[in-house]
Each structure stands twice: as C-alpha cells, then as structure tokens.
Amino acid sequence: MDALGLSKLRHLKPRQLLSQVLNFALILSTAFMLWKGLSVATDSPSPIVVVLSGSMEPAFQRGDLLFLWNRNLELDSPPTPGTRVGEIVVYNVIGKDIPIVHRVVRKHQGPKTPLHLLTKGDNNHADDTELYARGRWYLDREKEVIGSVVGYVPFVGYVTIMLSEHPWMKTALLGIMGLLVIVQRE
C-alpha cells in the first residue's frame, strides 16, 4: 500500500486534498480547451487523428498521428472547400464513428451541386464505395470530410490504439494519474 503512496493520502488535510483534486480538474479542463481551440483554428471537429489500419501503407503506418486542416490551403485564392485529386483526407461515414484516412482518386462538382469525392486507400485494391453509406457512390466533401492531412508524427498514436484495444489500461492509467496528482505535494 505504501509503494503507491496511499499512506500519504491519509495524512492530507481536507483543504490540501481539495487543492490537489482541483489541480487535476484544471489539467483536464486545460487539455479540453486546447483541443477545442485547435478544433476552431483548423475548422475540424477532430484536428488530430490516429491511423487505425494499414490501408494507407506505405504513406502512413498504423499508429501514425495525423494533423488535419479543413480550411483553404491556398492563401492567395478565395476560400473554397476545394480538394484536389491525390490529396489525403480523413472522413467519417454517416452512421459510423471511425475516422477513415484515404486518398482522393476522383472528384465531381457541378455548378449547383456540392463537391463529391471518391477515395481509396493506397494499400487497397478497390475504391471506398463499399465503405460509404448505403446507396452512396461518393462522399459529400462538406458533410463527411473531417479534414485534409497536413502533417504527421510516426507511431505516436500507438498509445491510443493500445488504450482502445485494452480498456483496463485506460482505467489504470487514469487512476494512477489521479493518484499521483492527489498525493504529490508542491
């Protein structure tokens, strides 16, 4: 019991304990505000995603951390949601919560119709029409695309993959972090 520092927890005064709990809440709320600020700056509901499969190899490996941008990348032109063929986008299929990272292989847009995209994983043999919502042959750029990939950090996302595949690790990690914040004195 003493190895975890729980004996120190008993000796904390209520005011010290409350201070440590509030410090932990401050850390969590700061992380949340940074995430929301990044979401606003990138115009993306999820500005950072992790590659979950090998469908984009060799460009991206499973566990790579991707940075997304959903604003116009060309600063000298008027803002448009233009996406080029060959660009790598991340999208959510309507009704599913898993972000998919694939390359745009074709685009269609009429004078009065929204931009529609056809995507395909670099390591896949066929395009993504099987992944789209039933009866859909293309993605609606405005409604389904989360953002375009502008950078990445290799393998850093494996931490989130491990926490998703082993829920007990998430609980243990949060418990240890909370305990360290409460027990540690400044």
From Swiss-Prot:
The C-terminal short (CTS) helix is essential for catalytic activity. It may be accommodated as a transmembrane helix in the thinned membrane environment of the complex, similarly to the signal peptide in the complex substrates. This is Signal peptidase complex catalytic subunit SEC11. Belongs to the peptidase S26B family. Keywords: Endoplasmic reticulum, Hydrolase, Membrane, Protease, Signal-anchor, Transmembrane, Transmembrane helix. It comes from the Eukaryota. It is a single-pass type II membrane protein. The active site is at S55, H102, D128. GO terms for molecular function: serine-type endopeptidase activity. It is found in: Endoplasmic reticulum membrane. Residues 42-186 are lumenal. It is an enzyme of class 3 (hydrolase). The keyword Cell membrane does not apply. Component of the signal peptidase complex (SPC) composed of a catalytic subunit SEC11 and three accessory subunits SPC1, SPC2 and SPC3. The complex induces a local thinning of the ER membrane which is used to measure the length of the signal peptide (SP) h-region of protein substrates. This ensures the selectivity of the complex towards h-regions shorter than 18-20 amino acids. SPC associates with the translocon complex. It catalyses: Cleavage of hydrophobic, N-terminal signal or leader sequences from secreted and periplasmic proteins. GO terms for biological process: protein targeting to ER; signal peptide processing. The chain crosses the membrane at residues 21-41.
